[in-house]
Swiss-Prot record:
The lineage of its organism: Bacteria, Pseudomonadati, Pseudomonadota, Gammaproteobacteria, Vibrionales. Its EC number is 2.5.1.-. It comes from Vibrio parahaemolyticus serotype O3:K6 (strain RIMD 2210633). Belongs to the class I-like SAM-binding methyltransferase superfamily. CmoB family. Homotetramer. GO terms for molecular function: methyltransferase activity; transferase activity, transferring alkyl or aryl (other than methyl) groups. One of its GO terms (biological process) is tRNA wobble uridine modification. Carboxy-S-adenosyl-L-methionine binds at residues 91, 105, 110, 130, 152-154, 181-182, 196, 200, 315. It catalyses: carboxy-S-adenosyl-L-methionine + 5-hydroxyuridine(34) in tRNA = 5-carboxymethoxyuridine(34) in tRNA + S-adenosyl-L-homocysteine + H(+). This is tRNA U34 carboxymethyltransferase. Keywords: Transferase, tRNA processing. NCBIfam families: PRK15068.1 (NF011650), tRNA 5-methoxyuridine(34)/uridine 5-oxyacetic acid(34) synthase CmoB (TIGR00452).
Length: 323
């Protein structure tokens, strides 16, 4: 069983987040009561990971945990085997006492594209929607954020996050909750909200943008990253079935169309700050994620297209302000 008591105590002391306590404990109790086939196995492995008190933690330039006195080889091998129990590792990379967790995604590259364009995170409270295993939350703390709350319904992502947090010494500035955005009340409590890699999974993208706006304080900043296509403000791709072998994908606007959508739901100061074609060096199969990845999803004869014939993945970052 997971104990979220620390988070409840934290938000009880925050006047903006206190109202969340009206619904959150029951939601997390319901989540605990739902069965997941592998969760018990993962939890046993998590409980075997040692409580960390590392001598060095670098979350400014990477996510790296190390000690002045290295682990014995046997201890390292045991730790690596425990961490490999949580395969596949999709978001990272992490370096833990010399163990390099080479994840499917180079999430640090995305962070390097996003960071120059956002308001400084120092002393801000942050919500990361669809946070994966929390890699970017650690980087947000590295930029001085006061509190990072991530939401993602994946059981495995929660386990991976808690494993890294345990090895870090139990840092209570970051918390991952196994929820979807639709389960959050209108909190209007966060200074910055991130939604990266989520919008194309939503059947109603405008509703998603409104849900994000509902979590921001007045004057707060949205950082939105999603798959886009090239084109003018009227260009939108709606795949008929899969896109790059992904199910449950719906709307791929152009960056210009997405800017219009953000303005339509009431955001101001909307800027397209980055567009980038995803490379096979940024998303690929690794020793820590052995399933198919981007190289398998592109047309082998024309890598500018997916295997379904759509334009290859292109991602845009937009920033916007809530009035």
């Amino acid at each position: 069983m997971f104990n979220f008591a620390n988070f409840y105590q934290l938000i009880a002391q925050d006047t903006r987040l206190q109202p969340w306590l009206n619904v959150l404990p029951q939601q997390l109790t319901d989540w605990q009561n739902a069965e997941h086939g592998d969760f018990g196995r993962w939890l046993k492995a998590l409980n075997k990971i040692p409580e960390g008190s590392p001598d060095q933690v670098d979350i400014k330039n990477s996510v790296t945990i190390s000690n002045d006195t290295p682990f014995h080889e046997g201890e390292l091998k045991k730790l690596e085997n425990l961490l490999r129990t949580f395969h596949p590792w999709r978001k990272g990379p992490y370096t833990v006492h010399g163990i390099h967790i080479d994840t499917e995604w180079r999430s640090d590259w995305k962070w390097d594209r996003v960071l120059p364009h956002i308001s400084p995170l120092k002393n801000r409270s942050v919500l990361d929607v669809g946070c994966g295993n929390g890699y970017h939350m650690w980087r947000m703390l590295g930029e001085g954020a006061r509190l990072c709350v991530g939401i993602d319904p994946s059981h495995l992502f929660l386990i991976q996050f808690e494993a890294i947090r345990k090895l870090m010494g139990g840092d209570q500035r970051a918390h991952l909750l196994p929820l979807g955005i639709e389960q959050l009340p209108k909190l209007e409590a966060f200074d910055t909200v991130f939604s990266m890699g989520v919008l194309y999974h939503r059947r109603s993208p405008l509703d998603h943008l409104i849900q994000l706006k509902d979590q921001l304080v007045s004057g707060g900043e949205l950082v939105l990253e999603t798959l886009v296509i090239e084109g003018d403000e009227n260009a939108v791709l709606v795949p008929t079935s899969r896109y790059a072998q992904m199910r449950n994908v719906y709307f791929f606007p152009s960056a210009k169309a997405l800017k219009v959508w953000l303005e339509l739901v009431g955001f101001e100061d909307v800027h397209i700050v980055d567009e980038n074609v995803t490379s096979v060096d940024e998303q690929r199969t690794t020793d820590w994620m052995t399933h198919n990845s981007l190289p398998d999803y592109l047309d082998p004869n024309d890598p500018s297209k997916t295997v379904e014939g759509y334009p290859a993945p292109r991602r845009a970052v937009l920033v916007a302000r809530k009035p």
